[in-house]
Amino acid sequence: AEGAAWEGTLADTWIELTDESTMMGCVVEALDGHTVVGAESNYISSIDNLKAFDGGTMSGWMGTLNDWFTNFGFGEFTVAKGTLCAGDEIRIMYTRTVEDLGGSWNNSDTRLKALTFSTGKLAPKFSGDTFTYTLTVPEGTTSLLVTPTAANKNYQVRAYLGTQATGREYSRTSLIPIENGSVITVVCADDSWPTMNKTSDGKRTYTINVV
């Protein structure tokens, strides 16, 4: 943005987890060679001199874990607690309004904004208000990536092969094995999942039948 100390992407890398890994530790490791201020106190206030409040009273650094704005500091998400796992995706971004990154405390919308697949044609066309779909994939397809995006990223989204109750959960970076007749279930804002928001519009479940 105009007047910013810098813009663009500083790092896009994989980090090898250990039993001692934390979300914050992964961020610091990924930004090795850059100047990160505040990580030791569990709040990043500056990266390479791009500081909190440089872009206004609401501006600063925020982070998502699997495209979800976490409800605690990054240091609270750890391998030891089972809240940081192989395949998880961490993004640290600079915001001016919070809502410019897709999160909001001002609404309780638990629909999906988008739902994409690495292959195949979805029918009908995706809408956050449509909850059942057919995904037609090319013959011989044995796996695919599912990338859901919440309308409000303060709510978690998870994907399952099968149902939420009996299926297996897959991370957003993991290929889901499929065959003709497979069912993929994408859930947003289960009541038992953490969120910074005090209320929600209730759990939303999207069912995708693979053919």
Predicted regions and their residues:
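Residue-level "contact hotspot" at macromolecular interaction interfaces
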Residues: T83-L84, P177
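Short, surface-exposed secondary-structure boundary micro-motifs
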Residues: Y94-T95
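Hydrophobic, secondary-structure "cap" segments at the distal end of domains
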Residues: D19-G82
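Beta-rich interaction/scaffold domains
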Residues: V98-V211
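Short, solvent-exposed loop/turn positions at domain surfaces
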Residues: A11, F77-T78, R172
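Eukaryote-biased recognition of intrinsically disordered, low-complexity regulatory segments
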Residues: A1-W14
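Loop/turn positions that initiate beta-strands
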Residues: G87-I90
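Short, surface-exposed loop motifs enriched in S/T, G, D/E and P with embedded aromatic residues
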Residues: T13-L17, L122-K125
